[in-house]
Amino acid sequence: MMTLEADSVNVQALDMGHIVVDIDGVNITELINKAAENGYSLRVVDDRDSTETPATYASPHQLL
């Protein structure tokens, strides 16, 4: 179980069971690390070039 406090959360369903989550007011590094600790997989999408970066544990170069 993960508990998360955020200013706002927006979730959009995609195909094949995937979702997109837009979260404001959260430390993204802490979120990715906590998700990985719980066996979940998150990807960070950089809007500038729409490149998906697999993120098991967050590092600064993944969070451009």
UniProtKB/Swiss-Prot annotation:
Pfam families: DUF5983. It comes from the Bacteria. Encoded by the CP4-44 prophage. This is Protein YeeW. It comes from Escherichia coli (strain K12).
